[in-house]
């Protein structure tokens, strides 16, 4: 009799849980329609991989790219809709979150054609690679819309686990295995630090997990200026710092950049920063609203260290990917200026604008590196000497992307930095802006040093790698060149038409 009653209770509880889940999916599912498209693409890839003996490779790329483009389209159709909170407060939809989701989808859409020839040359498993990229994209999108501590922790873990697997995708490469191990160990440590900070925030607010409810809880418990909040701030800053990779949380970045497959590095170099920036703005601005002076000071220190160390150490590098790793550390210092300025003085608008340009500049540079690496088998900066004599198009594309990264006019990078520094100056961050200007000049030096190597025309200085340079026989090299052309155009043309881009960025609601 007791067993019968317990069994009935179990069935009733299971039915209630199922009905609640169905209700959430039915009424809130439309708010995550772009994410649902990616999930459908993932399921389709798995079905094709498990049912087909001979994998139709073009179809796999087509399904992945189409799901990303359709997800972008769904986001654009939803633009300007009223902000909504769904899934019992776990997820928030507004223009601010959606523009970061758009940037992540844009990165992934450009990275897939960039990876085609590399995967064919290295004979890596194609389906798993695409699954990891789409799953990481999905995790990044959920992180952008996360509205509670649990989702903010689980979503980046979804992204991070796929990142670890992608960085170690070339299993026979010793450098790749070493990079993966460092990435995994430091990522696990940073996640534990982050969740420890969340526990302090959870306890201080009286057991709240939603971001806005945490603020209300801190007011009710009178804990908004307590030492516990300062401890939470320090731990959370360290945890998020690993994802953004500013100095001194940058130790993993050069090794992962150098050891991982180049298309993977291109993907991680932009998507991780976009997703982490979206999360950082919400965490610092909402739960730590009463500690703005403290987190401003912490971020200013990180920005200064990143801009100085990143650009100075980049000068000494001999590997192109390690140089870009330290360059990215310097670039995140500029982005942090926008986070500090905040919603006032167009800080977030300038950060979003600069990140859009940074995506095109960085991916364009990596597309050139992928092509050069496949045709020569080297990553050494000195081996680029004389590339202009063999492949003027590739050399000019790389030069334009590097000049845009350095911030030379009239390229997009110049206008992005100008807008970002102007907003910082208007907010009174004079010292940060001056450091940013000086380190930008330093970055121009090492970018110009590479461009000078590219344009060498004397035979005695041309390296054997360039002398024996051959175009790839693979049919898919057009896909890399397509990504490269799109990124090069986006790195140059938007600088002339900044106003529409700034207007869209300013239209985001936080």
UniProtKB/Swiss-Prot annotation:
It comes from the Eukaryota. The keyword NADP applies. It is an enzyme of class 7 (translocase). It is a multi-pass membrane protein. Its EC number is 7.1.1.-. GO terms for biological process: ATP synthesis coupled electron transport; photosynthesis, light reaction. Keywords: Chloroplast, Membrane, NAD, NADP, Plastid, Plastoquinone, Quinone, Thylakoid, Translocase, Transmembrane, Transmembrane helix, Transport. It catalyses: a plastoquinone + NADH + (n+1) H(+)(in) = a plastoquinol + NAD(+) + n H(+)(out); a plastoquinone + NADPH + (n+1) H(+)(in) = a plastoquinol + NADP(+) + n H(+)(out). It is found in: Plastid, Chloroplast thylakoid membrane. GO terms for cellular component: chloroplast thylakoid membrane. The chain crosses the membrane at residues 24-44, 57-77, 99-119, 124-144, 149-169, 183-203, 227-247, 295-315, 323-343, 354-374, 395-415, 418-438, 484-504. HAMAP family: NDH1_NuoN_1. NDH shuttles electrons from NAD(P)H:plastoquinone, via FMN and iron-sulfur (Fe-S) centers, to quinones in the photosynthetic chain and possibly in a chloroplast respiratory chain. The immediate electron acceptor for the enzyme in this species is believed to be plastoquinone. Couples the redox reaction to proton translocation, and thus conserves the redox energy in a proton gradient. NDH is composed of at least 16 different subunits, 5 of which are encoded in the nucleus. Belongs to the complex I subunit 2 family. This is NAD(P)H-quinone oxidoreductase subunit 2 A, chloroplastic. It comes from Panax ginseng (Korean ginseng).
């Amino acid at each position: 009799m007791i067993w019968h009653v317990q069994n009935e209770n179990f069935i009733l509880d299971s039915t209630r849980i199922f009905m609640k889940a169905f209700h959430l999916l039915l009424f809130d599912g439309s708010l995550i329609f772009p994410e649902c498209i990616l999930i459908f693409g993932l399921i389709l890839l798995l079905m094709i991989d498990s049912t087909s003996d001979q994998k139709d490779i073009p179809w796999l790329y087509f399904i992945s790219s189409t799901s990303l483009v359709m997800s972008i389209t769904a986001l654009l159709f939803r633009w300007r809709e009223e902000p909504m909170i769904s899934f019992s407060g776990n997820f928030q939809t507004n223009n601010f979150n959606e523009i970061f989701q758009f940037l992540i989808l844009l990165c992934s859409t450009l990275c897939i054609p960039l990876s085609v020839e590399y995967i064919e040359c290295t004979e890596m498993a194609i389906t798993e690679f695409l699954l990891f990229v789409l799953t990481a994209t999905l995790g990044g999108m959920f992180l952008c819309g996360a509205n509670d501590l649990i989702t903010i922790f689980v979503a980046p873990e979804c992204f991070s686990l796929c990142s670890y697997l992608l960085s170690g995708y070339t299993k026979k490469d010793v450098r790749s295995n070493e990079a993966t191990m460092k990435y995994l160990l430091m990522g696990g440590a940073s996640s534990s630090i982050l969740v420890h900070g969340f526990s302090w925030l959870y306890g201080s607010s009286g057991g709240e997990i939603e971001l806005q409810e945490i603020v209300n809880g801190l007011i009710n418990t009178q804990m908004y200026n307590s030492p516990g909040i300062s401890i939470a701030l320090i731990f959370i800053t360290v945890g998020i710092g690993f994802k953004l990779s500013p100095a001194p949380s940058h130790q993993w970045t050069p090794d992962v950049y150098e050891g991982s497959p180049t298309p993977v590095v291109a993907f991680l170099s932009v998507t991780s920063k976009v997703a982490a920036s979206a999360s950082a703005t919400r965490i610092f601005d909402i739960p730590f609203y009463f500690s703005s002076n403290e987190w401003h000071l912490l971020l200013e220190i990180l920005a200064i260290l990143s801009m100085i160390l990143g650009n100075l150490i980049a000068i000494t590098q001999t590997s192109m990917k390690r140089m870009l790793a330290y360059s990215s550390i310097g670039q995140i210092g500029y982005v942090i200026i926008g986070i500090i300025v905040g919603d006032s003085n167009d800080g977030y608008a300038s950060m979003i604008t600069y990140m859009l340009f940074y995506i095109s500049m960085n991916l364009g540079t990596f597309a050139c590196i992928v092509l050069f690496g496949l045709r020569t088998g080297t990553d050494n900066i000195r081996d680029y000497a004389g590339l202009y004599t063999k492949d003027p198009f590739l050399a000019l594309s790389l030069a334009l992307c590097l000049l845009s990264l350095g911030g030379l006019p009239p390229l997009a990078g110049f206008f992005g930095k100008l807008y970002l520094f102007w907003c910082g100056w208007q907010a009174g961050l004079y010292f940060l802006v001056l450091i940013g200007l000086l380190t930008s000049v330093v970055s121009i030096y090492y970018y110009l040093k590479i461009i000078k190597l590219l344009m060498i025309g004397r035979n005695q200085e041309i390296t054997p790698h360039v002398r024996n340079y051959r175009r790839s026989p693979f049919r898919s090299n057009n896909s890399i060149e397509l990504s490269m052309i799109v990124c090069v155009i986006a790195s140059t043309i938007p600088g002339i038409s900044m106003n529409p881009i700034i207007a869209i960025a300013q239209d985001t609601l936080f």
